Amino acid sequence: DLYFAYQEPDNKAFAHNFMVLAPSGLKTSIIPSLRTIQEFDPSWVIPEPAASNLRRMLKFEMLDENRSANKSNRTKNPNVQKIAVHEPLADLFGLVAVTNAEKVILDRIDKSTDGLFDFHDESEDEKDRVANELRNKIGKLPHLSILIDEVHHVASSNSDDEAKLRTVVNRWAANGSITTVLGFSGTPYLDKKEKVEVTAKHQITMTEMSNIAYYYPLANGIGNFLKVPKVISTGSNVRSEIVEKGIRSFFDTYKDTVYSNGTCAKIGIYCGTIETLETEVYPLVSQLCQEYGINPSEAILKFHEGNKQYPEPQGARAEFATLDKPFSKRRVVLLVQIGKEGWDCKSLTGIILSQEKDCPKKMVLQTSCRCLREVANARQETALIYLNAQNYKYLDEQLQKQQHITIEQFQQGRKQEE
């Protein structure tokens, strides 16, 4: 968009600025992942020297501030200030802003008695004013493309979020500033079947989102920009047996693996519940680490939100955010209700799903793929996926239904085309 917009600045077909929206429920894993947009290399798409020229034009803002900035002279909304620094907005070119859709864009919008949404435009309430201030400022961004990540969360939502978002975008579009609205999803499926009317007497139902415009096959990414996976089903459904086999296989293969960027190979274990993590998985993994000469206190990261019996592990949130840094010495990441989608940890080299409910049934494929992002060269990098018999079956079913490939083809990726 930026390349062609630079050639034809008055052509409304091409965006000058971009707003990336992430779902609220996934902010812990999604927002940090979206920060990697800053590392994108324009030469992946555009040849030099145009690529370097585009990189110099890019401006990146994370609109992630939740509290008012009391000392600001321009605004009491720090997210508005991040946009205001780029004024005059009419001439703005190359802004990429990332924000949490529900918490920021959809904040302080209520449904009135007539079923319409009330933006409280005339309200004197400070929170209403602050929320509208940001929406109004975004609405002034010229030639804006809106990119909605994990869009299936909006489409499948039982709340009014999708309708709210459409209402907000329509408001912006009324100003003539919206170029495109694009949604992205690795799992474009609805929670409930959608009825599509074909004629007055005929309709079809589908669980797949009906407005998919472009599809990129997973198999094309394997060995291209995704690690080559090895999928193993233990044939057992005993958690301890599966975890032990998975950890032993991981340490036997990747114990000494340090990637070219200085990060060490890691494995994620999805535990289902906090109690399972604390009482079953952690003691077992700790014992195995000691057996392999690895210090458990340095190697194991427990990450969950805590409960009455087991509080959230101190410092875990910060450590989770820095797992992909060379200074992180964590090798095993124990997870409860996080990291199933959108988690960007390139040094994650394996995952274990030892029980059926360690992740939702419909997300076995997506969770299994968490360990596939390449570090430097996907052709030379491998990953380990350890599953119990039931999750192996779910993975096979989802690959065939969603990607039209078998587990064997999944493990071959681009090799099957060569």
Regions found by a protein language model. Name each.
Residues 1-12, 33:
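Walker A/P-loop NTP-binding motif
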Residues 45-76, 80-81, 90-95, 107-109, ...:
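Conserved C-terminal RecA-like helicase domain
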Residues 12-58, 100-103, 271-278:
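Conserved Walker A/P-loop ATP-binding site and its immediately adjacent core
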Residues 97-100, 146-148, 179-186, 334:
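Structural recognition of the conserved hydrophobic beta-strand(s) that form the central parallel beta-sheet
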Residues 166-289, 413:
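Interdomain helical connector at the RecA1-RecA2 junction of SF1/SF2 helicase-like NTPases
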Residues 103-106, 113-176:
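SF2 helicase catalytic motif II
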Residues 306-407:
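Conserved RecA-like P-loop NTPase helicase motor core
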Residues 154-157, 190-191, 374:
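Catalytic P-loop NTPase motifs of RecA-like helicase/translocase cores
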